[in-house]
Amino acid sequence: MKTVLITGFEPFGGEQINPSWEVVSQLDNAILGGCRVVARQLPCVFGESLAVLNSAIDALSPSVVLAVGQAGGRTDITVERVAINVDDARIPDNRGNQPVDVPVIPNGPAAWFSTLPIKAMVSAIREAGIPASVSQTAGTFVCNHVMYGLLHKLSSMADVKGGFIHIPYLPQQAAAHPGAPSMAADTVRRALETAIITALYVDADIIVAGGATH
């Protein structure tokens, strides 16, 4: 049976929970599309997050790796297109590290593109009645760090797809951030299940507009 590795993060930035792990942990040992899903939590720490991720990939030999992170303020499920080779932290990570303009991988490419069928995933999530879009930036904090490091590792591995999805706050978090959008955990879970199945069985992405003007 094929394996899908899905990851979420521990809380950071003063939050008591991280919606990515709250939802991703529910998928551990699930069977989706005939494949076993394994969930792992990543520390919100530069360097350490990639060490944990790389160890999980080496141990599990997954067919798909989907990293998930919190994007407070976003209104929908956002499937990331690209990760860039820079750490530029506006706030410290959970170990107090705050790199500024430091490469994720020294001498690595300027960017890596997701190898997931991102537009097909967005389309399938929308068809499930859940708001979703392609995102053009994963930021420059630990989420981008993980996405870049993941894709850099997978570039030397045959037949393994990988990428990143950002999700909004959960309602209980938004209650502490008046005006902030949120999405229920059950809805996020359905979106991630849909994304996983699409990633498993769509090899060539669909050609539809998913860009941004700014």
Curated annotation (Swiss-Prot):
Family: Belongs to the peptidase C15 family.
Origin organism lineage: Bacteria, Pseudomonadati, Pseudomonadota, Gammaproteobacteria, Enterobacterales
GO cellular component: cytosol
EC number of the protein: 3.4.19.3
NCBIfam families: PRK13197.1 (NF009676), pyro_pdase (TIGR00504)
Function: Removes 5-oxoproline from various penultimate amino acid residues except L-proline.
Gene Ontology MF term list: pyroglutamyl-peptidase activity
UniProt key word Protease: yes
Gene field: pcp
Oligomeric form and interacting partners: Homotetramer.
Top EC class, one word: hydrolase
Name of protein: Pyrrolidone-carboxylate peptidase
Localisation: Cytoplasm
SUPFAM superfamilies: Pyrrolidone carboxyl peptidase (pyroglutamate aminopeptidase)
Entries under InterPro entries matching the protein: Peptidase_C15, Peptidase_C15-like, Peptidase_C15-like_sf, PGP-I_bact-type, PGPEP1_Cys_AS, PGPEP1_Glu_AS
PANTHER family: PROTEASE FAMILY C15 PYROGLUTAMYL-PEPTIDASE I-RELATED, PYROGLUTAMYL-PEPTIDASE I
UniProt keyword list: Cytoplasm, Hydrolase, Protease, Thiol protease
GO biological process: proteolysis
Catalytic activity of the protein: Release of an N-terminal pyroglutamyl group from a polypeptide, the second amino acid generally not being Pro
Active site positions, chain numbering: 80, 143, 166
Keyword Cytoplasm: yes
Pfam families (alphabetical): Peptidase_C15
Domain of life: Bacteria
